Amino acid sequence: MLINVISIFPKMFDIIKDYGITKRAIQKHLVKINVLNPRKFTKNKYKNIDDRPYGGGPGMIMTAEPLFLAINQAKSLSSNPVKVFYLSPQGKKLDQSKIMELSHQKHIILLCGRYEGIDERLLISKIIDEEISIGDYVLSGGELPAMVLIDSICRVTPGVLKNSKAIQEDSFYNGLLDYPHYTRPKCFNCIKIPNILLSGNHSEIKRWRLKQSLTKTWLKRPDLLNKLILTKEQESILHECQSKMDKPKI
Protein backbone atom coordinates (compact mmCIF):
# COMPACT_ATOMS: atom_id res chain seq x y z
CA MET A 1 0.00 0.00 0.00
CA LEU A 2 1.26 3.48 -0.87
CA ILE A 3 0.39 6.31 1.52
CA ASN A 4 1.29 9.75 0.19
CA VAL A 5 1.17 12.51 2.79
CA ILE A 6 1.11 16.21 1.93
CA SER A 7 2.54 18.27 4.78
CA ILE A 8 4.67 21.36 5.31
CA PHE A 9 6.44 19.46 8.11
CA PRO A 10 7.64 16.24 6.44
CA LYS A 11 10.21 15.47 9.15
CA MET A 12 7.41 14.90 11.65
CA PHE A 13 6.72 11.62 9.86
CA ASP A 14 10.26 10.32 10.40
CA ILE A 15 9.17 9.27 13.89
CA ILE A 16 6.46 6.86 12.78
CA LYS A 17 8.76 5.43 10.12
CA ASP A 18 11.36 4.51 12.73
CA TYR A 19 9.27 2.88 15.46
CA GLY A 20 6.71 0.19 16.19
CA ILE A 21 4.07 -1.22 13.88
CA THR A 22 4.62 1.33 11.11
CA LYS A 23 8.35 0.60 10.98
CA ARG A 24 7.60 -3.12 10.71
CA ALA A 25 5.06 -2.53 7.92
CA ILE A 26 7.63 -0.51 5.98
CA GLN A 27 10.44 -3.02 6.52
CA LYS A 28 8.21 -5.82 5.24
CA HIS A 29 7.41 -3.72 2.15
CA LEU A 30 3.70 -3.94 2.96
CA VAL A 31 3.30 -0.18 3.34
CA LYS A 32 5.25 2.69 1.80
CA ILE A 33 4.95 6.19 3.28
CA ASN A 34 5.96 9.12 1.10
CA VAL A 35 5.74 12.76 2.24
CA LEU A 36 5.47 15.70 -0.17
CA ASN A 37 6.06 19.27 0.98
CA PRO A 38 3.70 21.73 -0.78
CA ARG A 39 6.31 24.47 -0.38
CA LYS A 40 8.20 22.79 -3.23
CA PHE A 41 5.23 23.50 -5.50
CA THR A 42 5.00 27.24 -4.86
CA LYS A 43 5.88 29.79 -7.54
CA ASN A 44 6.96 32.62 -5.26
CA LYS A 45 10.56 33.10 -4.17
CA TYR A 46 9.66 33.02 -0.47
CA LYS A 47 7.98 29.59 -0.76
CA ASN A 48 4.86 30.90 0.98
CA ILE A 49 1.93 28.50 1.04
CA ASP A 50 -0.47 30.72 3.01
CA ASP A 51 -2.20 34.07 2.60
CA ARG A 52 -4.67 36.37 4.33
CA PRO A 53 -8.36 35.37 4.15
CA TYR A 54 -10.72 37.31 1.89
CA GLY A 55 -13.29 39.15 3.99
CA GLY A 56 -10.85 39.61 6.85
CA GLY A 57 -10.52 37.63 10.01
CA PRO A 58 -7.73 36.12 12.11
CA GLY A 59 -5.02 33.77 10.92
CA MET A 60 -3.89 32.64 7.50
CA ILE A 61 -5.28 30.23 4.90
CA MET A 62 -3.32 27.61 2.95
CA THR A 63 -3.46 28.60 -0.72
CA ALA A 64 -5.02 26.26 -3.26
CA GLU A 65 -2.42 26.06 -6.04
CA PRO A 66 0.58 24.49 -4.22
CA LEU A 67 -1.73 21.96 -2.55
CA PHE A 68 -3.36 21.17 -5.90
CA LEU A 69 0.03 20.66 -7.56
CA ALA A 70 1.26 18.50 -4.66
CA ILE A 71 -1.88 16.35 -4.90
CA ASN A 72 -1.38 15.89 -8.64
CA GLN A 73 2.24 14.91 -8.08
CA ALA A 74 1.18 12.39 -5.43
CA LYS A 75 -1.40 10.91 -7.80
CA SER A 76 1.26 10.44 -10.48
CA LEU A 77 3.35 8.23 -8.18
CA SER A 78 1.03 5.27 -8.69
CA SER A 79 -1.13 3.92 -11.50
CA ASN A 80 -3.74 2.71 -9.00
CA PRO A 81 -6.99 4.62 -8.38
CA VAL A 82 -6.54 6.98 -5.47
CA LYS A 83 -8.67 9.08 -3.14
CA VAL A 84 -7.58 12.25 -1.37
CA PHE A 85 -8.45 12.56 2.32
CA TYR A 86 -8.22 15.88 4.15
CA LEU A 87 -7.63 15.59 7.91
CA SER A 88 -10.11 18.09 9.30
CA PRO A 89 -12.22 18.58 12.47
CA GLN A 90 -15.17 19.10 10.11
CA GLY A 91 -14.85 15.60 8.67
CA LYS A 92 -16.62 12.38 9.49
CA LYS A 93 -15.27 10.90 12.70
CA LEU A 94 -12.77 8.09 12.18
CA ASP A 95 -13.76 4.64 13.41
CA GLN A 96 -12.57 1.06 13.00
CA SER A 97 -14.85 0.33 10.06
CA LYS A 98 -13.28 3.24 8.16
CA ILE A 99 -9.81 1.97 9.03
CA MET A 100 -10.69 -1.46 7.63
CA GLU A 101 -12.08 0.14 4.48
CA LEU A 102 -8.95 2.22 3.90
CA SER A 103 -6.62 -0.71 4.60
CA HIS A 104 -7.89 -2.40 1.43
CA GLN A 105 -6.83 0.51 -0.77
CA LYS A 106 -3.61 0.31 -2.77
CA HIS A 107 -2.97 4.05 -2.68
CA ILE A 108 -4.32 6.92 -0.56
CA ILE A 109 -3.34 10.57 -0.22
CA LEU A 110 -3.55 12.35 3.15
CA LEU A 111 -3.65 16.14 3.13
CA CYS A 112 -2.52 17.81 6.36
CA GLY A 113 -3.88 21.31 6.84
CA ARG A 114 -2.35 24.09 8.92
CA TYR A 115 -3.20 27.61 10.10
CA GLU A 116 -6.95 28.35 9.79
CA GLY A 117 -7.44 25.70 7.12
CA ILE A 118 -7.28 25.33 3.35
CA ASP A 119 -8.87 27.29 0.50
CA GLU A 120 -12.47 26.04 0.26
CA ARG A 121 -12.21 25.70 -3.52
CA LEU A 122 -10.20 22.50 -3.10
CA LEU A 123 -13.32 21.01 -1.51
CA ILE A 124 -15.85 22.62 -3.85
CA SER A 125 -14.04 21.38 -6.96
CA LYS A 126 -13.89 17.82 -5.55
CA ILE A 127 -10.09 17.75 -5.61
CA ILE A 128 -10.48 16.39 -2.09
CA ASP A 129 -12.69 13.32 -1.93
CA GLU A 130 -13.40 13.14 1.77
CA GLU A 131 -12.71 14.85 5.10
CA ILE A 132 -11.75 12.75 8.12
CA SER A 133 -11.73 13.82 11.77
CA ILE A 134 -10.21 11.97 14.74
CA GLY A 135 -12.43 13.73 17.27
CA ASP A 136 -14.36 16.82 18.27
CA TYR A 137 -11.36 18.95 19.17
CA VAL A 138 -8.89 21.16 17.32
CA LEU A 139 -5.17 20.48 16.79
CA SER A 140 -2.48 22.71 15.30
CA GLY A 141 -2.48 20.74 12.07
CA GLY A 142 -3.37 17.52 10.31
CA GLU A 143 -0.05 15.75 10.88
CA LEU A 144 -0.97 14.03 14.15
CA PRO A 145 -4.38 12.85 12.83
CA ALA A 146 -2.59 11.53 9.72
CA MET A 147 -0.20 9.58 11.95
CA VAL A 148 -3.13 8.12 13.88
CA LEU A 149 -4.68 7.02 10.61
CA ILE A 150 -1.42 5.54 9.29
CA ASP A 151 -0.73 3.61 12.50
CA SER A 152 -4.24 2.15 12.53
CA ILE A 153 -4.02 1.12 8.88
CA CYS A 154 -0.62 -0.53 9.37
CA ARG A 155 -1.93 -2.47 12.35
CA VAL A 156 -4.70 -4.16 10.36
CA THR A 157 -2.65 -4.73 7.21
CA PRO A 158 -2.26 -8.51 6.75
CA GLY A 159 1.26 -9.70 7.49
CA VAL A 160 2.31 -6.79 9.70
CA LEU A 161 1.45 -8.39 13.06
CA LYS A 162 2.91 -11.81 13.82
CA ASN A 163 -0.38 -12.95 15.35
CA SER A 164 -3.41 -11.95 13.28
CA LYS A 165 -5.73 -12.98 16.14
CA ALA A 166 -4.47 -9.96 18.09
CA ILE A 167 -6.29 -7.73 15.61
CA GLN A 168 -9.54 -9.67 15.93
CA GLU A 169 -9.46 -9.21 19.71
CA ASP A 170 -8.79 -5.47 19.63
CA SER A 171 -11.39 -3.04 20.89
CA PHE A 172 -13.88 -2.03 18.15
CA TYR A 173 -12.83 -4.84 15.75
CA ASN A 174 -16.09 -6.68 16.46
CA GLY A 175 -17.92 -3.57 17.63
CA LEU A 176 -17.14 -4.18 21.32
CA LEU A 177 -14.52 -2.93 23.73
CA ASP A 178 -11.66 -5.30 24.51
CA TYR A 179 -11.72 -7.63 27.52
CA PRO A 180 -9.30 -7.12 30.49
CA HIS A 181 -5.75 -8.43 30.17
CA TYR A 182 -3.48 -9.83 32.90
CA THR A 183 0.12 -11.07 33.00
CA ARG A 184 2.72 -12.02 35.62
CA PRO A 185 2.87 -11.78 38.59
CA LYS A 186 -0.31 -13.55 39.74
CA CYS A 187 -0.72 -11.03 42.55
CA PHE A 188 0.05 -7.32 42.31
CA ASN A 189 -0.82 -4.67 44.89
CA CYS A 190 -2.87 -7.33 46.73
CA ILE A 191 -4.99 -7.92 43.61
CA LYS A 192 -5.05 -11.44 42.19
CA ILE A 193 -5.87 -12.32 38.61
CA PRO A 194 -9.26 -14.05 38.03
CA ASN A 195 -9.06 -17.79 38.73
CA ILE A 196 -10.76 -18.63 35.44
CA LEU A 197 -7.63 -17.51 33.57
CA LEU A 198 -5.59 -20.15 35.42
CA SER A 199 -8.10 -22.96 34.86
CA GLY A 200 -6.88 -24.08 31.45
CA ASN A 201 -10.53 -24.42 30.36
CA HIS A 202 -10.39 -22.58 27.05
CA SER A 203 -14.13 -22.60 26.36
CA GLU A 204 -14.85 -21.08 29.78
CA ILE A 205 -12.06 -18.55 29.34
CA LYS A 206 -13.53 -17.57 25.97
CA ARG A 207 -16.98 -17.11 27.53
CA TRP A 208 -15.50 -15.10 30.43
CA ARG A 209 -13.72 -12.80 28.00
CA LEU A 210 -16.88 -12.28 25.97
CA LYS A 211 -18.77 -11.50 29.17
CA GLN A 212 -16.13 -8.97 30.23
CA SER A 213 -16.12 -7.39 26.79
CA LEU A 214 -19.90 -7.03 26.73
CA THR A 215 -20.01 -5.70 30.28
CA LYS A 216 -17.26 -3.17 29.69
CA THR A 217 -18.95 -1.95 26.50
CA TRP A 218 -22.33 -1.69 28.25
CA LEU A 219 -20.85 0.30 31.15
CA LYS A 220 -18.43 2.53 29.23
CA ARG A 221 -19.79 2.81 25.68
CA PRO A 222 -23.45 1.75 25.55
CA ASP A 223 -23.77 3.65 22.26
CA LEU A 224 -21.71 0.91 20.60
CA LEU A 225 -24.21 -1.77 21.63
CA ASN A 226 -27.00 0.18 19.96
CA LYS A 227 -25.20 -0.25 16.64
CA LEU A 228 -24.80 -4.02 16.94
CA ILE A 229 -27.00 -7.00 16.22
CA LEU A 230 -26.09 -9.31 19.09
CA THR A 231 -26.14 -13.08 18.82
CA LYS A 232 -28.40 -15.04 21.15
CA GLU A 233 -25.36 -16.01 23.21
CA GLN A 234 -24.25 -12.38 23.49
CA GLU A 235 -27.76 -11.26 24.47
CA SER A 236 -27.96 -13.97 27.12
CA ILE A 237 -24.59 -13.04 28.61
CA LEU A 238 -25.39 -9.32 28.54
CA HIS A 239 -28.74 -9.83 30.30
CA GLU A 240 -26.97 -11.95 32.87
CA CYS A 241 -24.56 -9.08 33.55
CA GLN A 242 -27.32 -6.48 33.63
CA SER A 243 -29.38 -8.47 36.11
CA LYS A 244 -26.51 -8.30 38.60
CA MET A 245 -26.07 -4.52 38.38
CA ASP A 246 -28.15 -1.46 39.11
CA LYS A 247 -27.40 0.28 35.80
CA PRO A 248 -30.57 0.48 33.64
CA LYS A 249 -30.77 -1.95 30.73
CA ILE A 250 -30.51 -0.61 27.19
UniProtKB/Swiss-Prot annotation:
Gene Ontology CC, one term: cytosol
EC main group: transferase
EC number annotated for this UniProt entry: 2.1.1.228
InterPro entries per UniProt: Alpha/beta_knot_MTases, tRNA_m1G_MeTrfase_C_sf, tRNA_m1G_MeTrfase_TrmD, tRNA_m1G_MTases_N, tRNA_MeTrfase_TRMD/TRM10
Cellular location(s): Cytoplasm
Pfam families xrefs: tRNA_m1G_MT (PF01746)
Residue numbers binding S-adenosyl-L-methionine: 113, 134-139
Keywords, in A-Z order: Cytoplasm, Methyltransferase, S-adenosyl-L-methionine, Transferase, tRNA processing
Reactions catalysed according to its record: guanosine(37) in tRNA + S-adenosyl-L-methionine = N(1)-methylguanosine(37) in tRNA + S-adenosyl-L-homocysteine + H(+)
Gene3D superfamilies listed in its UniProt record: 3.40.1280.10, tRNA(m1g37)methyltransferase, domain 2 (1.10.1270.20)
Protein's job: Specifically methylates guanosine-37 in various tRNAs.
Description of how the protein assembles with itself and partners: Homodimer.
Protein name: tRNA (guanine-N(1)-)-methyltransferase
Gene source species: Buchnera aphidicola subsp. Baizongia pistaciae (strain Bp)
